[in-house]
Amino acid sequence: MNGVEGNNELSLANTTTPSHASEDLDLKQDQGLQEETDTVREMEAAGEAGADGGASPDSEHCGPELCFRVAENSCAAAARGLEDAPSPSKGGDAPSAPVAADDSSKNGCQLEGPHSPAKPKALEACGAVGLGSQQMPGPKKTKEMTTTKCAISVATGKEGEAGAAMQEKKGLQKEKKVAGGGKEETRPRAPKINCMDSLEAIDQELSNVNAQADRAFLQLERKFGRMRRLHMQRRSFIIQNIPGFWVTAFRNHPQLSPMISGQDEDMMRYMINLEVEELKQPRVGCKFKFIFQSNPYFRNEGLVKEYERRSSGRVVSLSTPIRWHRGQEPQAHIHRNREGNTIPSFFNWFSDHSLLEFDRIAEIIKGELWSNPLQYYLMGDGPRRGVRVPPRQPVESPRSFRFQSG
């Protein structure tokens, strides 16, 4: 045994209490241990009941720490009792040292000197005895574990609250989107600017195409107009050498025949040519020109009937005055049809500009007779020739012209 241990034993022997003090200390320690044991058992029973009944995890984890504190308090009380006991005399109290040592060993506390480094070990041993057969970690580890578990529990609770807040926020955003979508659906949408630009571009393209078509039509009209004039000139030259060609064509036309009297037929036998000319800019209209040989009825070699469209849109008719020989005027001869009704002379068409029937004469001559005179000339000789040419349908011109005298 070294010197330090000897000194410790000596000091322990010197601090032992007398026999009656030792008995009182033992009684107090027994009562304290009994109370602490009962408290630990109640806490254990409460922990088991909490585990069975769904107690919180925090209370279950904190139970061992409380038990350790109870045991630590009992050892501390024992140590204080030894320190507070009156110091005995050096002489007669030495034999009671073993008794105190035995009592201390019963309580599981090996007490040493007040400044001895073995005091924490004694407290640790007392904690082990207080907890019974359970071997718990040291106080620091137990506190760290308890603090960690409590922190995890608090963090878990905070995460749950944060998740609930996020879910509620998402729900509010969805409701706002749904409400906003309903408002957008009910609101009428204005046409996009891009669509209007596209429509304007298409309209401009159509205008360009129409302008190109007009220019192309004018070019084709001039081209084929020249070709037609060449054929018309050749046709007119041939017709002039056929006696009574035009009077026969007029008489064979179903609509013009009722308008021609016997005297009109005699005057039209001197007719050698018919020309129809369309007027261009700046004058718009149509001109009819009848060419006659010398005859006993009038002095004119040509009679002209002209229709012109004015800037106001009204169509007016103009004609050449007929210079009649004396006593050959149409008014001097009264013509009646089979029903006894008076028939106006065909040549009144050149002088009278008020009758709508005369406007109809201009349309028939331009659209049917002049375009295909051979068809009507051959209508009377059809059975003899064995050929009947179907009437040619007039082609509608883009610049439609309707005759109306005024």
Swiss-Prot record:
<dbReference type="InterPro" id="IPR002164">
    <property type="entry name" value="NAP_family"/>
</dbReference>
<feature type="compositionally biased region" description="Polar residues">
    <location>
        <begin position="8"/>
        <end position="20"/>
    </location>
</feature>
<feature type="region of interest" description="Disordered">
    <location>
        <begin position="1"/>
        <end position="63"/>
    </location>
</feature>
<dbReference type="GO" id="GO:0005634">
    <property type="term" value="C:nucleus"/>
</dbReference>
<dbReference type="GO" id="GO:0006334">
    <property type="term" value="P:nucleosome assembly"/>
</dbReference>
<feature type="compositionally biased region" description="Low complexity">
    <location>
        <begin position="93"/>
        <end position="102"/>
    </location>
</feature>
<feature type="region of interest" description="Disordered">
    <location>
        <begin position="387"/>
        <end position="406"/>
    </location>
</feature>
<feature type="region of interest" description="Disordered">
    <location>
        <begin position="161"/>
        <end position="189"/>
    </location>
</feature>
<dbReference type="Pfam" id="PF00956">
    <property type="entry name" value="NAP"/>
</dbReference>
<dbReference type="InterPro" id="IPR037231">
    <property type="entry name" value="NAP-like_sf"/>
</dbReference>
<feature type="region of interest" description="Disordered">
    <location>
        <begin position="81"/>
        <end position="121"/>
    </location>
</feature>
<protein>
    <recommendedName>
        <fullName>Testis-specific Y-encoded-like protein 4</fullName>
    </recommendedName>
</protein>
<comment type="similarity">
    <text>Belongs to the nucleosome assembly protein (NAP) family.</text>
</comment>
<feature type="compositionally biased region" description="Basic and acidic residues">
    <location>
        <begin position="167"/>
        <end position="188"/>
    </location>
</feature>
